[in-house]
Amino acid sequence: FSSVPIINAGDGAGQHPSQTLLDLYTIRQSMPLEGIKVGLLGDLRYGRTAHSLAYALSLYHATLYTLSPKGLELPCAITEELTEGGTAIIEHDDVSTIIRDLDVLYVTRIQRERFPDSASYFRVASSYRITPELLSGVKERLIVLHPLPRLDEIDPAQLDAAPPPAVHRHRHAAPVP
């Protein structure tokens, strides 16, 4: 037994709602959740944190911009369910074309274990990276979130440059395994 409350939820590879609670809390510390514009970038097919966050943000009428390598898009079942419920989901293939409009950029890693070989993984993993140059000219209050573990998706120089934009590393707010 534990002397502190424990929240444990999820279904393995599909959802990670306890991480979403932390993400919503982090965003809410900086801005209201209602109607925000959120970019979901990375492995949206297998990234269970992105699945849960998309569902949660739909409750706040957020506009979701999805950006992922081919084959790692947000699952159709999630996209269909959310759009049928009124959530605006806009697919993009270039983060630089929309980043200035975003309130939040949620970056997930490309999961190496999902690829048959290293060459395939590196080809996809190198398709995007958050750099200081990419973030120049964004909203002053843009929040960049990453659920961890972080690989090379965010240039370490960007972490040193924060804020602005505020790059939140969840390890400061009790990470969720």
Language model segments and positions:
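General beta-strand structural signal in soluble alpha/beta enzymes
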Residues: I6-A9, H16, L40, E91, ...
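Short, charged, surface-exposed secondary-structure boundary motifs
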Residues: Q15-L21, P75-A77, P175-P177
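Rossmann-like adenosine-cofactor binding region
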Residues: L82-L159, P164
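Phosphate/diphosphate ligand-binding glycine-rich loop within oxidoreductases
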Residues: F1-R28, L151-I154
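Proline-centered loop/turn at the N-terminus of a beta-strand
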Residues: P5, T63, R141-I143
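Short, acidic/turn-prone active-site loops that include or flank metal/cofactor-
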Residues: G10-G14, P69-G71, R169-A174
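Glycine-rich phosphate/diphosphate-binding loop of Rossmann-like nucleotide-binding domains
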Residues: Q29-V107
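C-terminal helix-to-coil terminal segments
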Residues: Q158-P177
